[in-house]
Amino acid sequence: MDYARRLPRMFDPFFDQLEDRDRIDGLMTTGTNVLTKNLFGRLRAEPLSTATTFNGNMELETEFLSLRLGIPNIHTAAVPGVKVSVGVLSSVPAADYQVWINPENNEWLDFTIDLPARLGEERPSITYIDVAALASVARTDVANGRTIIIYRIEFPANSVASMPMNNQYYWRGSRAPRVLRTSNQAVQGVTNKAAFTSQAAYAATKGGDDYAVVPVVQYQTLARGHQVMICGDSIQEGIGGDVRCYGAMERSVYELSTPERPLEYFNAALHAQGPDLYSRMLADHVATVRPTIVTYSPWSGNDVTAGSGISAAAMRRLKASLGRVFYTLQAAGLRPVVLFPEATPVNTGYRNVGANDQARRDFNANWLPKVSAGFVIKGYAAALTGGRDAAGQDQIKDGLTGDGVHPNDAGHDALKAVVKPYFQRLLDRVA
């Protein structure tokens, strides 16, 4: 409800808080015990001439009772006969270039699945194994460490695997936000466990950093937390400079997450794509992920034309795509909190739109706040915005971008400072 502003305007922030409280009452703010991890957005299809097994050690946010792995397929055809093994670990090797290749007590659980073709252009199918009767075990290498799983995924010869489009550099070592180490070997490492011997996460060619199948992991937790679904273009996917799918949204989630109050994310963002496509990615998977928080970018620079700026047709598409998001959530019976990042500037040297940049500023200031079904992340654009050129186009602040459009590491940190309070507020409401 709206509160009558009869008192001095100095009380406006207080009334704003009351109105926001009323808006989120009844939404999915009490959290969930089913979390789904998907670290990478856009995928590429990688042909395999020989049978190949992908091995990985992955950290989850909190203790779990059971789990299931989802294997993505971005190929235009089905991939039958994929074999999956999963187990648990109590540690990871001290050296970040190594991975374990066997679980605790050599206890593997094995599954075989057939992967249907992709759901559409740039939209992978995700096929889940049955629920694995595996519970997490305590870490022995670090005190109070998060739980670790191990997996193997075996693809048959002459099949196609789906891998992170931009690889997964910086997901191990001192800069890694969570443990993710992968290795691979051209053997049938699920069929014959002993055949897989590759413990090296790095190789000059086709090493674990650039040649990996990373599964989706859905796990049922003891602690209650929030499930975030991130949807947008490259900025939301989290790329720019050295960043590989770990941008402001992802950082906000993992920096706030604790084993006692976990936050997990499903990265459904797709770089180089627009709202018409990435809103469909959300529609493809939202019923399985069942997020309690959705971050959705209604505006994408990929729909903005150099010189003329955003067209009337593109504006209609982005509004219709936002409508698709709400239709999808309603059809799935979901009422997550939806957060809208504002549209960010682009340097003139990257895409010159001149005075037409006013359309973006008007979108942020006037149109987006009218969408009552979500909350605008206020200050998101300002966190990146520097000066304005003579033609009227805002520029990204010096030092916050390397290419004039994507935030670099410092740029994502600047955005993160604006995003985190929204997640923290919702995390505080977990029942």
Language-model region placement:
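Conserved SGNH/GDSL esterase-like catalytic core that processes O-acyl groups on lipids
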Residues: 71, 116, 124, 132, ...
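General small-molecule cofactor/ligand-binding pocket signal
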Residues: 264-268, 337, 377-378
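Active-site segments of SGNH/GDSL-like serine hydrolases
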Residues: 297-302, 326-362
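Viral virion structural and adsorption modules
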Residues: 1-23, 283-288, 320-335, 365, ...
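Hydrophobic beta-strand segments of well-ordered beta-sheets in folded domains
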Residues: 146-151, 227-228, 291-295, 333-338, ...
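A short, gly/pro- and small-residue-rich
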Residues: 170-178, 308-328
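N-terminal secretory targeting modules
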Residues: 4-7, 11-231, 236-237, 241, ...
